[in-house]
Amino acid sequence: MSRKHLTARQQEIFDFVKHHIETTGMPPTRVEIAREIGFKSPNAAEEHLKALARKGYIEMLSGTSRGIRILVDNEETAANDDGLPLIGKVAAGTPIMAIEHVESHYPVNGAMFNPNADYLLKVNGNSMEKIGILDGDLLAVHKTNFARNGQVVVARVDDEVTVKRLEKKGDLIYLHPENDELQPIVVDPRIEYIEIEGIAVGVIRNNAWM
């Protein structure tokens, strides 16, 4: 069954619900969702959950504050008939502006990656060359706003996007290159905007899996 695409906010909430279940073993409450996302009221979280339910991503169970059941793991949105969307470019060196539209589709099933890939981004630069992410590669990305230390992430810093290895340390976030000639990007989220756009789950080079 084909499901409707999610808005950015709906995707953020869906990812948080999944992450909360994976890390705690139970769904979050509306209060916990509101606190995490920044809503002033749990009612706002409730409305977004209803939208997710209407689109077929979750089931809302009555009679409990944690009555949320995941129905889909985004696999169906990744594995569509057109293949994976190729969205803009990502700098693996100096960050460049992300292009927020689909340039084309690539004939590959996102479910072949683990976790599944939701889109592809073209790499520009060699800052991740030590781990085999090279200039011109297509980076398979699982769309999520949550990542662990050490994962290779697609991160938006202000209005630019880059691929780096994530490290959260104290109040700062370090985006480390895999190139000895380059320095990490250091972000203070108290004064700079940063958002995780996804985690790298694979690389396609010259039409072949890497």
Swiss-Prot record:
Annotation: DNA-binding region: 30-50
Keyword Transcription: yes
Molecular-function GO terms, alphabetical: DNA binding; serine-type endopeptidase activity
UniProt protein name: LexA repressor
Species of origin: Actinobacillus pleuropneumoniae serotype 7 (strain AP76)
Matches recorded under Gene3D superfamilies: Umud Fragment, subunit A (2.10.109.10), Winged helix-like DNA-binding domain superfamily/Winged helix DNA-binding domain (1.10.10.10)
Domain of life: Bacteria
UniProt keyword terms in alphabetical order: Autocatalytic cleavage, DNA damage, DNA repair, DNA replication, DNA-binding, Hydrolase, Repressor, SOS response, Transcription, Transcription regulation
Quaternary assembly: Homodimer.
Marked site: Cleavage: A92, G93
Function: Represses a number of genes involved in the response to DNA damage (SOS response), including recA and lexA. In the presence of single-stranded DNA, RecA interacts with LexA causing an autocatalytic cleavage which disrupts the DNA-binding part of LexA, leading to derepression of the SOS regulon and eventually DNA repair.
EC number: 3.4.21.88
Catalytic activity field: Hydrolysis of Ala-|-Gly bond in repressor LexA
